[in-house]
Amino acid sequence: MPLTDPAKLQIVQQRVFLKKVCRKCGALNPIRATKCRRCHSTNLRLKKKELPTKKG
């Protein structure tokens, strides 16, 4: 079910995309994290910010 309401879409994007991903173990971390919560590595990246497109 695609979202058409811009306000709801913005809320979903903030919940889903404002995360950091550990490059060592793949754990999701808060956006303000400096170390991974699982393996304590400092090698973090931002989650990729693109919505999946509907194929068809």
From Swiss-Prot:
SUPFAM superfamilies per UniProt: Zn-binding ribosomal proteins
Coiled-coil blocks: none
GO molecular function: structural constituent of ribosome
Gene3D superfamilies named in the record: 4.10.1060.50
Entry-linked InterPro entries: Ribosomal_eL40_arc, Ribosomal_eL40_dom, Ribosomal_eL40_sf, Ribosomal_zn-bd
SMART domains attached to this UniProt entry: Ribosomal_L40e (SM01377)
Keywords per UniProt: Ribonucleoprotein, Ribosomal protein
GO annotation terms (biological process): translation
Pfam families the record matches: Ribosomal_L40e
Keyword Ribonucleoprotein: yes
A single GO cellular-component term on record: ribosome
Family: Belongs to the eukaryotic ribosomal protein eL40 family.
HAMAP family associated with the record: Ribosomal_eL40
Name the UniProt record assigns to this protein: Large ribosomal subunit protein eL40
Organism of derivation: Saccharolobus solfataricus (strain ATCC 35092 / DSM 1617 / JCM 11322 / P2) (Sulfolobus solfataricus)
Organism lineage string: Archaea, Thermoproteota, Thermoprotei, Sulfolobales, Sulfolobaceae
